[in-house]
């Protein structure tokens, strides 16, 4: 059967959802690995990554079941949810690519003071830095309580803000690029589901409704 027929659309939709399932399982696995090795101890970060992985896994399972059974209702809701995810993810990805360093610095500065002292100290040890941006009274207090390895050396410690900016700039570009790529795969998924949903199953009763 030529590609574009019922079997080809079904196989393409199944393959796409298998990829989504693998990505979802990968996110859950990475979060569990990071928690197990102590790479990330924040329960909010771990919970967020696992939630995204589970959500993606559920969408993929719904799409896969809908594709295998040619289930009209499941395919309809799959298209709606995937379309909404595309709009949200596309907007977030564009924002990640468009955000400048000044805005990043403001976000980092605001986030730093929300963190608990234990989380700040953990970040300082991980990135081998002390304090955030400027030599204010608060920074001096942070520097005094800092337990990073750089405190044992004669040279002054680098401020964490500059280190965070370097990492955040690179991370935002990667996240934005990956997000845009997955956004277009979601549009492909919506198109495949719509096409497949409107096709007639050759094994079904010819007089039955689509």
Swiss-Prot record:
Ranges in the topological domain labelled Extracellular:
34-44, 94-173
- Could you tell me which InterPro entries the record lists for this protein? Tetraspanin/Peripherin (IPR018499), Tetraspanin_animals (IPR000301)
Location (main, coarse) = membrane
Indicate yes or no for the key word Transmembrane: yes
Per the UniProt entry, the signal peptide is none
| Ranges annotated as spanning the membrane | 13-33, 45-65, 73-93, 174-194
What GO CC annotations are associated with the protein? membrane
Q: Has the keyword Transmembrane helix been applied to this entry? A: yes
Q: Where in the cell is it found?
A: Membrane
The membrane-topology field of this record reads:
Multi-pass membrane protein
Q: Which domain of life is it from?
A: Eukaryota
Which segments does the topology annotation call Cytoplasmic? 1-12, 66-72, 195-210
Keywords from the named record? Glycoprotein, Membrane, Transmembrane, Transmembrane helix
Q: Which residues are glycosylated?
A: 109, 117, 134
The Swiss-Prot or TrEMBL record describes its family as follows: Belongs to the tetraspanin (TM4SF) family.
What is the designated name of this protein? Tetraspanin-31
Organism source for this protein? Rattus norvegicus (Rat)
- Gene behind this protein: Tspan31
